[in-house]
């Protein structure tokens, strides 16, 4: 069972070393789940004397006003008889103190290091472990004494600040409260009892200690309180007799003081029947046994909390990403790896693993055919326009059989209008690819760490897409222009035969501009243009996919990679300038994860029975 208190001691020390003081923060706290005994009392209540009596050593700073200005986590470890007793501070891990006057001075010095030489207070605890044959395994937290007025050099808020600090410890359900009250004062006004009842109205966590019993007025005693008939608590009150100021001045040692305490309760008529339940030695043993029971009951819940929190912290740490490499090669590798992840996500969008790529197909299957269908050839093939273009093409020599130049001009003027839908398809696919770049950037978790790299990758990808669009537009419009520059001969070779089948080809050339003839020309041109549209409907998507989609998958960041190879250390570092908030969060999560893993190992190493 003694291992359980040692276990909690180790975890408490790890908590303090890694910044978990149980204060409110955005991080999970292990400190709050650990059972502890907090010592609460007003100034001059005898709180320090009780602690020194339990330890059996003079080691606490003394003086007027507020002496305890930081929580002192006092961890007592029983060692074998005959072994020399010593003390260790968590902040001085390799130094053993055998002179307890030096311990007192170090407590004062460490307090001043945190608070300055003012009379301010701090919630950051000091950890002190004392190893002695004369103690029981016990952990106590000495809190600043409650006060009603501020002294010179202290802020007006000190009274409330101390109360808030004390309350922050004792209001936690795993905290056992040791309420110190002087017997020579009215218990109804006890600061310790008052605040304890506020946070623990049922008294399930509160132990009462009466000090200065030997200083009560003649004719009065504390029997009713100690017997539980007055100011009743769930656990029995314990009376103690501490050294007087005169004893302290005379350097009366603790062994003699404990002996005198035992004799006082044994020899005083009023308390003789309670003697075996009084005194600092009984108090220490009672608290040690109670703390053991509480720890044992809490261990399963602590284990469950630790295991759950470790998983949560590991998940968040993974999401935050790895810390930045220090050397140029490491930085370059990190950037390339992040870019590779982005590129992979972008390809997954195009290949259908992620949503978005289907929009490109929709352009070819719906948007382009619909745009071609909406083209208005009526204007080019209106009767007046056909007559105008045919006669202009003939010049001063009318055509003999078929108005070839007229056909060419009519076809060219109609096919040119296809450039609009072709160009629109290129632009639409470009917009889709840009949107997929932004989506891929947002979905690349690693890019969230580095805002500068995020901007550079986005800009580089968009710049590449812009160049690909220009190449695609040029190639696609060339397809349209090729249809204008060379007509499909086989289509027109059939026209004379059709003419012969339909009538007299030797009809007067002056009658060939009649409406029937012109309509026939218009019909032939429209048939040819429709044939061209059908062909371009298939070839334009191929050109766009080849020049834009395929190239985006192959070489979206090639130019950026080439630039990376020329960057110096300063430029690479600027790309990996991480958001300070993320850096701080990762550092905090790493420390807290280290704490929980250490606690996990400590619990696993202790043999305890459920």
Swiss-Prot record:
This enzyme's EC code(s): 3.6.5.-
Spans annotated as G2 motif: 67-69
Effect of residue 47 to A: Dominant-negative mutation leading to a prolonged residence time of clathrin at the plasma membrane and impaired endocytosis of membrane lipids
GO terms of molecular function: clathrin binding; GTP binding; GTPase activity; protein histidine kinase binding
GED domain location: 518-610
Region annotation (G5 motif) ranges: 241-244
Residue ranges constituting the Dynamin-type G domain according to the UniProt record: 31-300
GO terms classed as biological process: cell plate formation involved in plant-type cell wall biogenesis; cellular response to boron-containing substance levels; clathrin-dependent endocytosis; cytokinesis by cell plate formation; embryo development ending in seed dormancy; intracellular protein transport; regulation of endocytosis; regulation of establishment of cell polarity
Chain residue ranges for the region called G4 motif: 211-214
EC class: hydrolase
Observed effect of gene inactivation: Vascular discontinuity. Short and swollen roots and hypocotyls due to cellulose-deficient walls associated with increased levels of arabinose, xylose, and galactose in non-cellulosic polysaccharides. Infertility due to the inability of stigmatic papillae to undergo rapid polar expansion prior to fertilization. The alteration of cell wall formation correlates with abnormal phragmoplasts and division plates in dividing cells, as well as reduced cell elongation and disturbed endocytosis. Hypersensitivity to trafficking inhibitors (e.g. brefeldin A, monensin A and latrunculin B).
Chemical reaction(s) catalysed: GTP + H2O = GDP + phosphate + H(+)
Spans annotated as G3 motif: 142-145
Name of the protein this chain belongs to: Phragmoplastin DRP1A
Organism: Arabidopsis thaliana
């Amino acid at each position: 069972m003694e291992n359980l208190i040692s276990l909690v001691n180790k975890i408490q020390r790890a908590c303090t070393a890694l910044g978990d003081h149980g204060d409110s923060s955005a991080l999970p706290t292990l400190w709050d789940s650990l059972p502890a005994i907090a010592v609460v009392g007003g100034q001059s209540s005898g709180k320090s004397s009780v602690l020194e009596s339990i330890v059996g050593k003079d080691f606490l700073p003394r003086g007027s006003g507020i002496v305890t200005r930081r929580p002192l986590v006092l961890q007592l470890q029983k060692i074998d008889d005959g072994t020399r007793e010593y003390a260790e501070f968590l902040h001085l891990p390799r130094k053993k103190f055998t002179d307890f006057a030096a311990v007192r001075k170090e407590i004062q010095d460490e307090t001043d290091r945190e608070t300055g030489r003012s009379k301010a207070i701090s919630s950051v605890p000091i950890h002190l472990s004392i190893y002695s044959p004369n103690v029981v395994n016990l952990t106590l937290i000495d809190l600043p004494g409650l006060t009603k007025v501020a002294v010179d050099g202290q802020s007006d808020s000190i009274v409330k600040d101390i109360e808030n600090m004390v309350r922050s410890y004792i209001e936690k359900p795993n905290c056992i409260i040791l309420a110190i009250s002087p017997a020579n004062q009215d218990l109804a006004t006890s600061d310790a009892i008052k605040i304890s009842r506020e946070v623990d109205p049922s008294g399930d966590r509160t132990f009462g200690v009466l000090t200065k019993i030997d200083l009560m007025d003649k004719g009065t005693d504390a029997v009713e309180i100690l017997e539980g008939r007055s100011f009743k608590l769930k656990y029995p009150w314990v009376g103690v007799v501490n050294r007087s100021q005169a004893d302290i001045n005379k350097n009366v040692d603790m062994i003699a003081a404990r002996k005198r305490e035992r004799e006082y309760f044994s020899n005083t008529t009023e308390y003789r029947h309670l003697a075996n339940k009084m005194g600092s030695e009984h108090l220490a043993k009672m608290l040690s046994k109670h703390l053991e029971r509480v720890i044992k009951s809490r261990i399963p819940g602590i284990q469950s909390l630790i295991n759950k929190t470790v998983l949560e912290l590991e998940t968040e740490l993974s999401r935050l990403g790895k810390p930045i490499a220090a050397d140029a090669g490491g930085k370059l590798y990190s950037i390339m790896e992040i870019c590779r992840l982005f590129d992979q996500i972008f390809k997954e969008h195009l290949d259908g693993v992620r949503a978005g790529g289907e929009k490109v197909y929709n352009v070819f299957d719906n948007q382009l055919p619909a745009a071609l269908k909406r083209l208005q050839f009526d204007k080019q093939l209106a009767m007046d326009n056909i007559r105008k273009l045919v006669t202009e093409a003939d010049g001063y020599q009318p055509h003999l059989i078929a108005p070839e130049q007229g056909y060419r001009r009519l076809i060219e003027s109609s096919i040119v209008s296809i450039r609009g839908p072709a160009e629109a398809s290129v632009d639409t696919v470009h917009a889709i690819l840009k949107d997929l770049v932004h989506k891929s950037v947002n979905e690349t978790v690693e890019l969230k760490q580095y805002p500068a790299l995020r901007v550079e990758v986005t800009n580089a990808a968009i710049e590449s897409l812009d160049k690909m669009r220009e190449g695609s537009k040029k190639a696609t419009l060339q397809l349209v222009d090729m249809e204008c520059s060379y007509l499909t001969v086989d289509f027109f070779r059939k026209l004379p035969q059709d003419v012969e089948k339909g009538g007299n080809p030797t009809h007067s050339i002056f009658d060939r501009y009649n409406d029937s003839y012109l309509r026939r020309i218009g019909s032939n041109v429209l048939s040819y243009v429709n044939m061209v549209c059908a062909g371009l409907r298939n070839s334009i998507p191929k050109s766009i996919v080849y020049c834009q989609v395929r190239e985006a998958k192959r070489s979206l960041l090639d130019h950026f990679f080439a630039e990376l190879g020329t960057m110096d250390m300063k430029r690479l570092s600027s790309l990996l300038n991480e958001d300070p908030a993320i850096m701080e969060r990762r550092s905090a999560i790493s420390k807290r994860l280290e704490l929980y893993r250490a606690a996990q190992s400590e619990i696993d190493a202790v043999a305890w029975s459920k």
